[in-house]
Amino acid sequence: MAQSAPLVIGATGGSGTRVLARIAKHAGYNLGANVNASEDALEFYAFHDTWINPFTRSQRSGPAMSPWQSARMIEDFYAALARHIPEPERRGTLWGWKAPRSIYLLPFLRNECPHLKFIHLLRDGRDMALSSNQNQLSKHGEAVLTLSERLFRSTAQRSMLLWKKVNLRAADFGEAQMPENYLRVRFEDLCAQPLETTTRIMNFLGATIDPAPIARSEITPPQSLGRWRECSRRVIANLERAGASALRRFAYLA
């Protein structure tokens, strides 16, 4: 029996991807056994740590990866995949992984798995910039942002720039290169319109089960939603200037 293509769930850190993993599992997807409390696939952790920065730099007109690096990256990917769900268990089943940082590697993943489905979760960049979770900025900010973008800016401003660049890059690639297999979901829509948004996700996954009980049981808006509204107008204005193009594209700004 042939191996099916994976489902991958990605986002910038702290967007709320756990709920998407729960929805996918209701739809029958095996997202692996070695996961943490947030449903992150732990077998990809070291792979992401090793390869996101060199791959991102090569995509950003930086030094190209050498043939040896490219071959090693592919080797490491398939080793992580085999640990995550062994190949025999993937045959003829619905499977995939939820690992937010996979969003940085979408072109690579699409090249290795041409028919993969990708769910891109977004959360308002103003919320993200003001979050205490800045792990992705710490790990990958230097690879994503230029020197001028990193200098003389607050952590929140750098976080907003990272949010803008990573999400725009993924959106551009998904829409252009895999339109039938790319779904973008705003976390705010999940919270405000749980049934309608869960239905969209189920349709994308080809699931025929009733989305209503899943939406009721799995979606609870966190208290941190819209936290940016508690900040000063000056702070928010600076963030909105930094992220304007993405905030507008993703309908967070008019």
Where are these regions (language model features)?
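PAPS-dependent sulfotransferase catalytic core
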Residues: 1-79, 215-221
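PAPS-dependent sulfotransferases, especially Golgi type II membrane carbohydrate sulfotransferases
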Residues: 1-8, 13, 133-136, 142, ...
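Glycine-rich phosphate-binding loop used to anchor ATP phosphates in small-molecule kinases
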Residues: 77-105
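Surface-exposed cleft-lining segments at the edges of enzyme active sites
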Residues: 91-95, 137-138, 145-160
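Hydrophobic/aromatic beta-strand patches that form the interior of the parallel beta-sheet core
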Residues: 7, 117-119, 183-185
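Conserved phosphate-donor/acceptor-positioning beta-strand/loop module used by diverse small-molecule
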Residues: 98-99, 109-134
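PAPS/PAP-binding and catalytic site of the sulfotransferase fold
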Residues: 16-29, 109-113, 133, 184-209
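Short His-Asn-centered micro-motif
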Residues: 9-12, 97-100, 187
